[in-house]
Amino acid sequence: MPSRRQEELVLQLLCQGALRALRSSIRRAHIAETLAELGLKISPIDLSRYTYGSHMPKPQKALELLEAIHGSGLSRMIVEQKVSVDEMGVVNVPLLACDLDILLLAASAAYLEFRGLADAVLTAAVNGIPLATLVAWALGAKLAVARRERESTIMRYIEAEIFLSDPPSVSHLYLPAGVLQRGERVLIVDDLLRSGRTLRALTRIAESAGAYVVGVVALLAVGDGWRYAVPEGARVLVLHTVRVSAGR
């Protein structure tokens, strides 16, 4: 379990990363004005120091800044600027899944929503790994990655099927047995929620291990067809929802 000082450092680094993500596309004056409207008056000099890491905000200030960044719509502006959908309804998920600005904003949002609530972060290879890694670090949780193939013939695995519709086929996810422990609180993290099939398979893996899902985090959601797969009682955090007619 991380020490209190480690947790404070993580919070400060998340704040600094979120501010840097904002500065990639938003003027410093607009950031300062928005924060001031929420009662956080920060001088341009201090804002610059926080952004580039020459000086870190105190932990309580860092928490207040993160809450303001996500509560004010500033983080949403960044995501909306970077999401694109082509004429075929294809979302640029692979690019977003490796965009450090987006990942830092998503990880800090997950921290605000799930700090102290998750023992493990579970994802499916491969696009979900970057975000899941950052979220696991932010929460001080272990990382569990389910893959499409068995990596060893002698290891035992927990397995879940995924039924694909186009073309009709069956895929599988495999997680080495013992990675998740009975009674652990699991946060499922993925790059995209669309059909809910991957989410349902990851949920079955967690349940087969005797763990239970406390929440779901995703960079993007397309439509609402995935919501049936959310485990009862689990919280959901989606950075941005795209309205297109396509299936995954």
Role assignments for model-derived ranges:
Residues 117-125:
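Short glycine-rich phosphate-binding loop at a beta-alpha junction
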Residues 28-33, 45:
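Residues within the helices of the helix-turn-helix
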Residues 141-186:
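Short, glycine/charge-rich flexible loops or terminal/linker lids adjacent to PRPP-binding catalytic cores
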Residues 32-37, 66:
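The alpha-helix within a helix-turn-helix
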Residues 9-29, 51-117:
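Active-site-facing substrate-recognition patch
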Residues 2, 7, 204-248:
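PRPP-dependent phosphoribosyltransferase catalytic core
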Residues 36-57:
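Recognition helix of helix-turn-helix/homeodomain-like DNA-binding domains
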Residues 181, 188-208:
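Active-site/ligand-binding-proximal alpha/beta "capping" segment
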